[in-house]
Amino acid sequence: MKIFVDTSAWVALENKKDTHYKEALSFKYEIKNKRYRLYTSNFILDETYTLLLANIGYEKTIEFTKIVKILRNKGLLHVIQVTEDIEDTALLIFERFNKDKFWSFTDCTSNAIMKMIDVDECFSFDRNFEQMGFIKRP
């Protein structure tokens, strides 16, 4: 099974003060047990690194970047690079749906990527993914 990991999940896993920390940790073990294939994007990691730096500090953020590197090197995490084609698709999504919603451009790139790689589950605490028609976990 495949699952896309959103910024809110990464932050919840790393920030013990996050309101979703315990829930995220519990779901992390489910991911391991069910052997999900993890996907995220360079845009998601950009957001995550910035938020972690602001909320948990430099040292812990650098530790997290090293964990990401290890997961990538072991083939446990696939980081999709947002290309110009993905950006173009994301912009169409952004323009079409934000008349009555508030989806960040990064969320729109995630939407485009998830459709491109045929992933319908997202590890996230962001309700936008349900609005987009994906299954939000946990």
Residue ranges and their predicted role:
Residues M1-T40, L53-K66:
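Short, well-structured N-terminal submotif of metal-dependent ribonuclease cores
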Residues V5, Y39-T40, Q81, F105, ...:
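Short beta-strand scaffold positions
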Residues I67-T83, E87, N98-D100, F129-P138:
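Short acidic, glycine/proline-enriched helix-loop-strand junctions
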Residues L77-D120:
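Active-site neighborhoods of divalent-metal-dependent phosphate/nucleic-acid chemistry enzymes
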Residues N111-P138:
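Acidic, PIN/NYN-like endoribonuclease modules and their adjacent C-terminal/linker elements
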